[in-house]
């Protein structure tokens, strides 16, 4: 039985940890996850999914602000390998060097493409038709370590980032376990990343503002890429309206203002983009309200009027 220290925080992390926990070839001797966050709406402490699972299964866990602070604790465990999945914190080289087989990392992109903290968002924003799960060795440089194996998959054109996340969460645990067993049993070899790297860094606040000057394909990719979180937005009458679903309608023969509402129906709010391309907004969130289909909104009181403009 191989001893593992697991580093992770997200829902994806929890799903991977869960399958590792139930696999008879592994012993989870400790888990390292991010410190609890505070929900600013109700001021309550919110543990990560990973911490909740550890409490449920009585697994030893640590929540350091910096991983190096628990070096002595981890050293005592004499684990065979570290496994990192969406940990969200820099791992010091001294921590990596504690493990005879170093620390491996599951990264949901076809490395060296989309190194960084938001590869799923940028897969959709870039309109990629294919992607991959990559198991790599953790090194000092971000997501630049040698690759053990990659598992390719097709990206559905209708997926938003939430849909892609569901796919990754369903397929990552078994792939990670397969690779971990191969690595520990020395059945295979590492290979260096080939090609020019690109980056999928965390989405900045200013990037959440959707750009009406884009062509419709890029605009729709941004809508899907920011959905369901953080949600891309447009300004209307001084309020930020989040857009969660939209589709292309047609190119208009008339000259419209950028962002102009050209039609409102149960099917959606049609607005003009650059070059008079018309898209239909189908799912939105007005400040203070829940996310709703446009068909729900137009039955009641709403601020949208043909001729007015989103910005």
Swiss-Prot record:
Keyword terms of this UniProt record: Protein biosynthesis, Transferase
Single GO MF descriptor: methionyl-tRNA formyltransferase activity
Record SUPFAM superfamilies: FMT C-terminal domain-like, Formyltransferase
One cellular-component annotation, GO: cytosol
Residues noted as binding (6S)-5,6,7,8-tetrahydrofolate in the record, renumbered to the chain: 109-112
Name recorded for this polypeptide: Methionyl-tRNA formyltransferase
Transmembrane spans: none
Protein function: Attaches a formyl group to the free amino group of methionyl-tRNA(fMet). The formyl group appears to play a dual role in the initiator identity of N-formylmethionyl-tRNA by promoting its recognition by IF2 and preventing the misappropriation of this tRNA by the elongation apparatus.
Cross-referenced Pfam families: Formyl_trans_C (PF02911), Formyl_trans_N (PF00551)
Leading EC class: transferase
Family: Belongs to the Fmt family.
Gene Ontology biological process: conversion of methionyl-tRNA to N-formyl-methionyl-tRNA
InterPro entries registered for this protein in UniProt: Fmt, Formyl_trans_C, Formyl_trans_C_sf, Formyl_transf_N, Formyl_transf_N_sf, Formyl_transferase-like_C_sf, Met-tRNA-FMT_N
Record gene name: fmt
Top-rank taxon: Bacteria
Organism per entry: Mycoplasma genitalium (strain ATCC 33530 / DSM 19775 / NCTC 10195 / G37) (Mycoplasmoides genitalium)
Reaction it catalyzes: L-methionyl-tRNA(fMet) + (6R)-10-formyltetrahydrofolate = N-formyl-L-methionyl-tRNA(fMet) + (6S)-5,6,7,8-tetrahydrofolate + H(+)
């Amino acid at each position: 039985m191989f001893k593992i220290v697991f580093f992770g925080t997200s829902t994806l992390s929890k799903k991977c940890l869960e399958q590792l926990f139930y696999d008879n070839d592994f012993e989870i001797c400790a888990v390292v996850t991010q410190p609890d966050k505070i929900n600013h709406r109700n001021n309550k402490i919110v543990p990560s999914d990973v911490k909740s699972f550890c409490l449920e299964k009585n697994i030893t866990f640590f929540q350091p602000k910096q991983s190096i602070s628990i070096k002595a604790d981890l050293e005592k465990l004499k684990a065979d390998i570290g496994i990192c999945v969406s940990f969200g914190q820099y791992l010091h080289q001294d921590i990596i060097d504690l493990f005879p087989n170093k620390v491996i990392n599951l990264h949901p992109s076809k490395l060296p493409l989309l190194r960084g903290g938001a590869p799923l968002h940028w897969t959709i924003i870039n309109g990629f038709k294919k992607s991959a799960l990559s198991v790599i060795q953790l090194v000092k440089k971000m997501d630049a370590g040698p690759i053990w194996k990659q598992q390719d998959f097709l990206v559905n054109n209708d997926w938003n980032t939430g849909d892609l996340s569901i796919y990754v969460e369903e397929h990552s645990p078994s792939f990670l376990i397969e690779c971990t067993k191969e690595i520990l049993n020395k059945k295979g070899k590492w290979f260096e990343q080939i090609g020019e790297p690109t980056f999928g860094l965390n989405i900045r606040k200013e990037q959440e503002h959707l750009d009406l000057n884009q062509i419709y394909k890029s605009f729709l990719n941004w809508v899907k890429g920011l959905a369901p979180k953080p949600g891309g937005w447009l300004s209307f009458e001084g309020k930020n309206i989040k857009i969660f679903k939209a589709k292309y309608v047609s190119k208009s023969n008339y000259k419209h203002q950028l962002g102009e509402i050209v039609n409102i129906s149960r099917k959606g709010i049609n607005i003009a983009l650059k070059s008079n391309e018309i898209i239909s907004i189908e799912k939105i969130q007005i400040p203070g309200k829940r996310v709703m289909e446009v068909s729900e909104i137009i039955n009641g009181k709403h601020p949208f009027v043909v001729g007015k403009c989103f910005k």
